[in-house]
Curated annotation (Swiss-Prot):
Protein name: UPF0145 protein BRADO6695
Disulfide bonds: none
Family: Belongs to the UPF0145 family.
Transmembrane residue ranges: none
Superkingdom: Bacteria
């Protein structure tokens, strides 16, 4: 199990001071929905509303990308990730790329 990692979308962590910035880190996931899933989703898109199959796939992909980000930051020696963000893009018509990225840092409680 990974040691505890503080992940924030801000530049600083309240109550902590930054000891060292280690640099950028990221976690990337590319997901594809199979032909059957695309067919069902396309039928649902005709009616309108949320397409639950894609929502679930993207939520899982974000969690997976965040897990990879934490793993990569840990391997760099970080105990925190600051300025964390998500980005996404379509690859072709059937794949989605999800990227979680931020700055790996070493922090300690403020004195």
């Amino acid at each position: 199990m990974e040691p505890s990692m503080i992940v924030v979308t801000t530049e600083n962590v309240t109550g902590y001071r930054t000891v060292r910035m280690l640099g950028q880190c990221f976690g990337v996931v590319v997901r594809s929905r199979g032909i059957g899933g695309n067919f069902i989703a396309s039928l649902r898109s005709i009616v309108g509303g949320e397409i639950h199959e894609y929502t679930q796939m993207l939520e899982e992909a974000r969690r997976h990308a965040l897990d990879r980000l934490v793993h990569n930051a840990t391997s760099m020696g970080a105990n925190a990730i600051v300025m964390m963000r998500f980005d996404s893009a379509e690859i072709g018509q059937t794949m989605s790329e999800i990227v979680a990225y931020g700055t790996a840092a070493v922090i300690e409680p403020a004195r």
